[in-house]
Amino acid sequence: YILENYKYYMVLGITSVTIFNSIVYYSLNFTQVISGVLMISTIPVMIIFISSILKIEKTNTFQILGVTCSFIGVVLIITKANLGILINLDFNKGDITMVFGMLSWATYSALLKKKKHELSQLTLLEVVISFGFIFLIPIYFIEYQVGYRIVLNQNFFMILFYVVLFPGL
C-alpha cells in the first residue's frame, strides 16, 4: 500500500518535515517570537483556503466564522489586547520566509484530508517522517559544503530530540 502511494506520502513528508520544520526554525533566527506565533496562528485560515482551492473540502460559513474568532482570540491573547503591538510590528526576512513554511504546512494538512488512509496513525506518522528525513539529507550536505558543521555534543542531541519528536506530534 505504501509503495502504491509513495508519491503521495513523499509529498506529505516534504511539505511537513522537510519544508515546514526547516523554514520555521530558519525563520525564527530573523523574526520576533510574537511575529512567528501570530503568523503560525493563521495556518487554519490557510488550510481552509488551500483545501477549497484543491477542492478537497468545501468551506462553510461556520468554519470561516470559527477560524476568524480563533484568530482574533489568538491576537488578543498574544498582544494582551494592546493593538499598538500589532501596529508596531515590522516585517522582515524571517516573517517572509515564515509565510512559505505556513503555506507548506497548510498544503500538508489539506492533502492529509484528501485520501482515506489504510495505515494506522502511527504507521502514517512513521512513513511521513521517513520521507521527510530522506529529503533533509541533501540539505545537510549543502550546509556541510557551505561550512556549517555539526558538533556531536549533548546540546546537539537535546536539540535533535526536540526537533524530531515534538513537531511531528
State where each predicted segment sits.
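Hydrophobic transmembrane alpha-helices of multi-pass small-molecule transport proteins
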Residues: 59-81, 136
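Alpha-helical transmembrane segments of compact multi-pass small-molecule transporters, enriched
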Residues: 39-53, 68-69, 131-135, 158, ...
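Residues that define the loop-to-transmembrane-helix transition and helix capping
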Residues: 7, 34, 60, 122-123
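Transmembrane alpha-helical segments that form core, pore/gating elements
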Residues: 47-49, 53, 85-144
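Juxtamembrane helix-entry segments on the extracytoplasmic side of multipass membrane proteins
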Residues: 2-6, 79-104, 141-162
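Specific transmembrane alpha-helical segments of multi-pass solute transporters/efflux pumps
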Residues: 1-35, 39-40, 76, 164-169
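Membrane-helix boundary and inter-helical linker elements of multi-pass secondary transporters
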Residues: 29, 55-57, 117
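Residue-level signature of transmembrane alpha-helical cores of multipass secondary-active transporters
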Residues: 9-13, 25, 37, 67, ...
